[in-house]
A protein has these predicted regions:
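Sec-dependent bacterial lipoprotein signal peptides
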Residues: 1-19
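Juxtamembrane proline-rich low-complexity "stalk" or linker regions positioned immediately after a signal peptide
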Residues: 26-56
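C-terminal edge strands of extracellular/lumenal beta-sandwich accessory domains
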Residues: 44-70, 92, 148-151, 155-174
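Acidic, Ser/Thr/Pro-rich low-complexity intrinsically disordered segments
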Residues: 84-90, 94-145, 151-153
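Bacterial signal peptide processing site
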Residues: 21-24
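N-terminal secretory signal peptides
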Residues: 51-97, 101-105
Length: 174
């Protein structure tokens, strides 16, 4: 649409006259703007736990250790019970996604049983939780996705004598 020069001149003169007497020209009425619909909230990212490579994990175990992969229920919890007899024990594998926290409660039948929690990807052999020092409860925040091994054990002196004890584990990944 083109504007006629005379119409523009009249509009400018009217605005100038109103400005001179301290008034402003009325703005043309605008159609009420519709409020845009809020964008749908993005779904929270789902933490994806890594797959458990049992063959690779078995390579990290001693001949006296057997591997069991814990299956978490819908709430992210699992429990297990077992026995340590001498050096023989079951090692429990738990996959944990980046940003999740692995919580483990170890309940031994005697004071000579402990558990360590080890990041399977850590080749240094250092435990993320040392039961003898840190106690029977572990809480580990995963900086990256990985598999953690829960390793019940007894000290060498009692293991060499072939002593045994039972335990219960309560595991949660949140």
């Amino acid at each position: 649409m083109t504007s006629h020069p005379r119409s523009l001149a009249l509009a400018a003169a009217a605005a100038f006259a109103l400005a001179g007497c301290g008034q402003q020209a009325a703005k043309p009425a605008e159609a009420p703007a519709e409020t845009p619909a809020a964008p749908a909230a993005a779904p929270a990212p789902v933490a994806v736990a890594p797959a458990v490579d049992q063959a690779a994990l078995k390579g990290l175990l001693s001949p006296d250790e057997t591997l069991e992969v814990l299956t978490l229920d819908a709430t992210g919890a699992a429990s297990a019970s077992g026995e340590v007899k001498g050096y023989k024990t079951t090692v429990y594998a738990v996959p944990v996604a980046q940003g999740q926290t692995l919580s483990v409660a170890f309940e031994p039948s005697n004071t000579n049983l402990y558990m360590n929690v080890v990041d399977a990807a850590d080749t240094s052999g250092a435990a993320a939780h040392r039961g003898e020092v840190d106690g029977p409860k572990a809480s580990i925040a995963a900086a990256k996705a990985g598999v953690y091994l829960i390793k019940p054990f007894q000290p060498r002196a009692t293991a060499r004598r072939g002593e045994s004890g039972t335990f219960k584990l309560a595991v949660a990944v949140k």
